[in-house]
Amino acid sequence: MAHRVEQDYDYLFKIVLIGDSGVGKTNILSRFTRNEFCLESKSTIGVEFATRTLQVEGKTVKAQIWDTAGQERYRAITSAYYRGAVGALLVYDITKRQTFDNVLRWLRELRDHADSNIVIMMAGNKADLNHLRSVAEEDGQTLAETEGLSFLETSALEATNVEKAFQTVLAEIYHIISKKALAAQEAAAANSAIPGQGTTINVEDTSGAGKRGCCST
């Protein structure tokens, strides 16, 4: 979802949060969108999303961040959840090795359902619990490099690198969108220079933003 619309923002980017249940996706969402953290937050039931508007290279971007439970029983919503996403944060818990071991499965699912150009940031969350660490930062960095992903360790509790993670993803999405728009303009200019040619290339979806849907406890 990368809409260019005549509203109070220039672009609307849909970003999905994925990863096992309990890794801190909901607190990452609330930290980025509301600057809040809840120590007793429960697992998300179904799907919820929140938005935040910010500046990316002089453009006003509305980030629509989607969060869903990681349990297998919610896999039925996979296709709808990923549809239209242009960015993703793949989150694991640095204190739980199994959540890191499951990263490749989540990555495979993401690549199966999302656009091939989706921008992915892998986030090793709960970096504030370094004394309980079971996944070395180097392991996360190595896996990210192997898979061609960006990587940061984050702490929703201490607000460490949460802002940077989203800003990095949003900036990369914007660069991709800008390159596509420029290529389309160049192609249109080339076509207009050919007698008898008048091709219009539309690379922007101007449909309205999706309706808000939220169900959480």
From Swiss-Prot:
CDD domains: Rab11_like. SUPFAM superfamilies: P-loop containing nucleoside triphosphate hydrolases. A motif (Effector region) lies at residues 41-49. It is found in: Endosome membrane; Golgi apparatus, trans-Golgi network membrane. Keywords: Endosome, Golgi apparatus, GTP-binding, Lipoprotein, Membrane, Nucleotide-binding, Prenylation, Protein transport, Transport. Expressed in root tips. A lipid is attached at C214, C215 (S-geranylgeranyl cysteine). One of its GO terms (molecular function) is GTPase activity. The keyword Membrane applies. Intracellular vesicle trafficking and protein transport. This is Ras-related protein RABA2d. It comes from Arabidopsis thaliana. The gene is RABA2D.
